[in-house]
Structure formats: C-alpha cells, structure tokens
Amino acid sequence: MSNGIVIIGSGFAARQLVKNIRKQDTGIPLTLIAADSMDEYNKPDLSHVISQGQRADDLTRQTAGEFAEQFNLRLFPHTWVTDIDAEAHVVKSQNNQWQYDKLVLATGANAFVPPVPGRELMLTLNSQQEYRACETQLRDARRVLIVGGGLIGSELAMDFCRAGKAVTLIDNAASILASLMPPEVSSRLQHRLTEMGVHLLLKSQLQGLEKTNSGILATLDRQRSTEVDAVIAATGLRPETALARRAGLTINRGVCVDSYLQTSNADIYALGDCAEINGQVLPFLQPIQLSAMVLAKNLLGNNTPLKLPAMLVKIKTPELPLHLAGETQRRDLRWQICTESQGMVARGVDDADQLRAFVVSEDRMKEAFGLLKTLPM
C-alpha cells in the first residue's frame, strides 16, 4: 500500500483502530485528519465534569503530538475534509489533498438539538471542544434545564444536582430512559433523581427559549414556563454522514456497512458512532472496540467478519448506577423484578421463559457477568 490508510476522525474509534493496526503492522502509512485538536480525552468523563470541578483542559490524556510519535502517524488537526473523490481515491480539504489506498470514516455523531425557537441558546456536551466553549456558563449556572431523559440526560441531571445546582429535566416520554427500558425498570433511578431534588417534567414538551435579563425563559406546553441559566440538549445523537453522502456511499441512519465494516465502496470503511452495521447503530464503547479489532485485520488483508456478543451498557449515575444488556427495549418481554435495599435485578423473559434482557443496579451489578453468559448470542 503505497498511499496507505487514511482515517477521517480522531475520537475513540479512530484511536482504537490505530492501536490495533500498529499491533500488526508498524510500517504501513497511517494518516489521520480531523476538525478538532486530536488530543485524547475520555468522552464518558463529560457526564461528570461539573461535580468533579473539571475544566475542559483537565480531560486531556495525551496530546496529538505524543499520539503521532507513539504510533508513527501523520496527523492533520483542525482540518475540515470537504470532499471525497472515491473514484480517484482522494480526500480533499480546502488547502490540501491526500491519496489513499483504503479510507476509514470515523466521523462520529452530532448531538441533536430540537428545532424550537431559540434553539441557538441550547448547549451540547458531546465533545471536549463543546464543553470548552460553554464551561464558564455551566460552572456559573445555578439553574439548569436538561432537555431529554435518556442515558446522557439522566447522567447529566444527577451530576449537576450533585454539584449543587437546581436541575429540571424535561422529556416527552412518561418515564426516564424510555428508549432503553420500560418504566417499571427505570423507576428506581427515577425515584432516586427525584429524592436528590431533580425536578422531572415528564410527558412534557419544550416549545421555545428566549433570553431575558436574568437568564433564559423556557416555554413549555400546557401554558407553563420556567426560567433557568443554562439549557442542555441531551436528545440523542445523529451519525455524521454528510461526507459519506457526498462520496456517493449508501446512507440510512448512519453510513451503511456490512460485517466487514465495508461501505458500498470496496475501499472505504466506516467505524464508530457514524457507522450503521447491518442496520444497527451502536454508539457504545464495547462494540466500537470489537469493531476496531476486526477492521484492523480487514484493512491489512485478513478478511474477518464482525461477530458481536451480548454486551453490557453502563449508565454512570453514581448515586444509583445501572448495567443493562440484551433487548431491553423489546415491548413483548415479561419483566421479573427483584428489588431490595442493596439494589435491583430485573430480568426480561420471552414467552418461552428465555432470558432476553436484564438490568441490574448498585450492589447487584456484580451479577451482570453471570447473567450476560445466559443471554442468547
């Protein structure tokens, strides 16, 4: 490979891929291009920065220069890729272009901001860069509105509350974590958040935001309103697909790839939050780690299909942490819930009494690995 491998992106997926390639081949040319600084940080830490009193720069684990030196890379930080010429095997920016033999899209996903009047007043916490842009406002805010009661929204609500802020969480669902599990399973965490002082506005809708002399006025449905100092959108992620679309690749929710992480173009692959693997978008660390291991082999000529086992998802709410696995969102499961002071074990079984999903909390989380082994592949 005279031109080697070009990777667009520098997040967790890109770094895992680099490490796995270098374990097998120390010499193949590797070029990384990204719009950010390319410094390494642990993205899940963003859910805890406020209670930990961390600044954006405190999150940096390794600088781009150290990364390049350690793994023998060509890095192009603060560089926006404008186009991919798939036929000519060329990646273009405004001032540069790069030939590739194999190209990997690791462009991640963007935080979705609800399209309401005043949406520009909403903050997002999807990257170190985004946190850096709003850390002063968040640190100084006494009253915080979090829009979205999913995984990230629940983590942030607890974190801001632990930091002593007045937190309101709004979601149009009837319970928190509604896309992940039924209300009878999430109710333990929901109750804990309420006990801590989080004001939950469920089955409610944000209709608009407006700057006032003393903060931000949030207008809600049913003629309600509340004034806050900061509003955070935690309404999910949308895979970044614009470049792939311009390159003529097949797109659905994400960049469509097969079990080999290959797109509709034989020399272009996708990895991480931007990828849709056989119809599934999996924006969690473990599937990305396993995908990076397989893709490294495939880029180096060892065709290996990705086989994902049942995997744990961790909800990092320290006052009441949860682990879950399996098809927790399936509507047809019957839930067997055992709750005690040390924690909860909720088992989701099908009509044949086969375990299909589980959620465990607090001290009962140590049972997760045993339950994981009994889930079907």
Swiss-Prot record:
Annotated catalysed reactions: 2 reduced [nitric oxide reductase rubredoxin domain] + NAD(+) + H(+) = 2 oxidized [nitric oxide reductase rubredoxin domain] + NADH
One Pfam family from the record: Rbx_binding
Protein's gene: norW
Cellular component aspect of the GO annotation: cytoplasm
Gene Ontology MF terms: oxidoreductase activity, acting on iron-sulfur proteins as donors, NAD or NADP as acceptor
InterPro entries in UniProt: FAD-bd_OxRdtase, FAD/NAD-bd_sf, FAD/NAD-binding_dom, NO_rdtase_NorW, Rbx-bd
Record's keyword terms, sorted: Cytoplasm, FAD, Flavoprotein, NAD, Oxidoreductase
Top EC class of this enzyme: oxidoreductase
Cofactor: FAD
Localization, UniProt: Cytoplasm
Entry superkingdom: Bacteria
Keyword Flavoprotein: yes
E.C. no: 1.18.1.-
The protein's role, per its UniProt record: One of at least two accessory proteins for anaerobic nitric oxide (NO) reductase. Reduces the rubredoxin moiety of NO reductase.
Pathway the protein contributes to: Nitrogen metabolism; nitric oxide reduction
PANTHER family registered for this protein in UniProt: NITRITE REDUCTASE [NAD(P)H], PYRIDINE NUCLEOTIDE-DISULFIDE OXIDOREDUCTASE DOMAIN-CONTAINING
Family: Belongs to the FAD-dependent oxidoreductase family.
Name of the protein described by the UniProt record: Nitric oxide reductase FlRd-NAD(+) reductase
